[in-house]
Every structure is written in structure tokens, then in C-alpha cells.
């Protein structure tokens, strides 16, 4: 039984999917870095739509981690962990941190 051709196709598909996931994670990182900078550069009230985007992205990344069991690098894992809580006081806390120059939730 020659299983190599099918196995090779699966490996090639796996490689392509992994590369696509890594590219998408990099895009998430770039968007999050931009959001963090924008949040830190504006007042708290004007930052609310930006926070909405940031917490939406955190939720999507948490789905990747917990539902699909894809373990990203430490930086993304830290973001998922630290931005798990989305409420007024959490937003105040992160707004102050980002305004003080923190570039990534840690």
C-alpha cells in the first residue's frame, strides 16, 4: 500500500495552512500595536471604539486558543490573558497604562 502521495498532499496542505495562520497572527499583532498606540494617544472617552476593536480581537484570539487549540507565541498568549476582562475599570486601567507608554499588554 502506497500511502506517501496522499500523506505528502496532507503535509503540503498543513504547511500552507500553518503559514497562513502565522501571517494572520502577524496582522493581528500589527493591528493591536496600532490600537494600543491610538488608545494611548487619545482621551478615555474617544478611546472607547478603539477598546471595542481591541477586545473583539482579544476574543477572536481567545477562540483560536481555547476552541481550536492553536497555541500562539507568548506575546499573543499574554494579550489573551491580560485582556480577558472587559469592563469600565479594566478599560480605565489599560488606558492609563497605554497613555504612560506601554506598547503591549503585559
From Swiss-Prot:
InterPro entries in alphabetical order: CdiI-like (IPR049759)
Superkingdom of the source species: Bacteria
Record CDD domains: CdiI_NC101 (cd21060)
Record function comment: Immunity protein component of a toxin-immunity protein module, which functions as a cellular contact-dependent growth inhibition (CDI) system. CDI modules allow bacteria to communicate with and inhibit the growth of closely related neighboring bacteria in a contact-dependent fashion. Neutralizes the toxic activity of cognate toxin CdiA-NC101 (the C-terminal 154 residue CT fragment). Does not inhibit toxic activity of CdiA from other toxin-immunity modules or strains of E.coli.
Subunit structure: Forms a contact-dependent growth inhibition complex of CdiA-CT-NC101, CdiI-NC101 and EF-Tu; the complex is a dimer of heterotrimers.
The name this protein goes by in its record: Immunity protein CdiI
Taxonomic placement: Bacteria, Pseudomonadati, Pseudomonadota, Gammaproteobacteria, Enterobacterales
